[in-house]
A protein has these predicted regions:
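Structured catalytic-domain cores with a bias toward divalent-metal coordination
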Residues: 1-223
Length: 223
């Protein structure tokens, strides 16, 4: 049937374009979050009944079963694996990383050069495109107390010279990656640098994502 494509952030347009390209080529179902009419194109979803806008990728918790069940309904009907698609800020927060602290400061944790007790990077050795960009990578999750090699397709992607970050999960952070791991669902997240809405830049980001998708599906999914 094809993958379940997940695009939880409405401001990550390359992820949405990659999902559309993916479903045309590989089939499956796209689940994308619309952040709301008044606040369209935002990371947080304002289309809530009450309270503040939420991060749609931090709502996969036991207290909200209806949300997860709705988002993942097609997985139960055979749309798999889950392929999450994201874009991220350039670089990483060197103040919170345990490695490469002399790099140019950036934002967040999404980089093959970031590491801590949770995020453990396995960089591409050749750095061939699309992995010439440190912000272009695959995330795979593994359960604390086991081995990174138990992550879904993680070892295969690392052996194929992807940039791979192995995420150690002890307690869920409410993300889809954690939820999928703790429930035994096949899941991988592909990330690339956010390059804006200029058509050429948007295409560049989308193409990095689709390059990872195409290779990973050949490597990880039996047809």
């Amino acid at each position: 049937r094809g993958p379940l494509w997940s695009v939880p952030h409405d401001n990550e347009n390359a992820g949405f374009e990659a999902a559309l390209a993916g479903v045309r080529k590989h089939g499956g179902v796209v689940i994308a979050v619309d952040s709301g009419l008044a606040e369209d194109g935002k990371r947080r979803n304002a289309a809530v009944d009450r309270g503040r806008p939420i991060d749609p990728n931090r709502n996969f918790r036991d207290g909200y079963p209806r949300y997860a069940n709705t988002v993942l309904a097609d997985y139960r009907d055979g749309a798999r694996p889950i392929i999450a698609l994201h874009t991220n800020s350039r670089g990483f927060d060197t103040g919170t990383s345990r490695c490469n602290q002399s790099d140019r400061p950036g934002r967040g944790e999404v980089s093959i050069r970031f590491c801590d007790d949770v995020m453990q990077p396995h960089p591409s050795q050749s750095r061939d495109w699309p992995f010439d960009d440190d912000d272009t990578l695959a995330y795979v999750a593994w359960r604390n107390g086991t081995s990174p090699s138990t992550s879904w397709c993680g070892r295969t992607l690392a052996n194929a010279d992807f940039n791979v970050v192995f995420e150690r999960v002890a307690v869920t952070d409410g993300s889809l990656s954690n939820y999928a791991l703790l429930r035994g669902l096949d899941y991988v997240n592909f990330e690339t640098q956010e390059r804006g809405l200029d058509p050429a830049a948007l295409a560049q980001a989308r193409n990095r994502l689709t390059a990872m998708i195409d290779r990973a599906l050949k490597l990880c999914v039996r047809r």
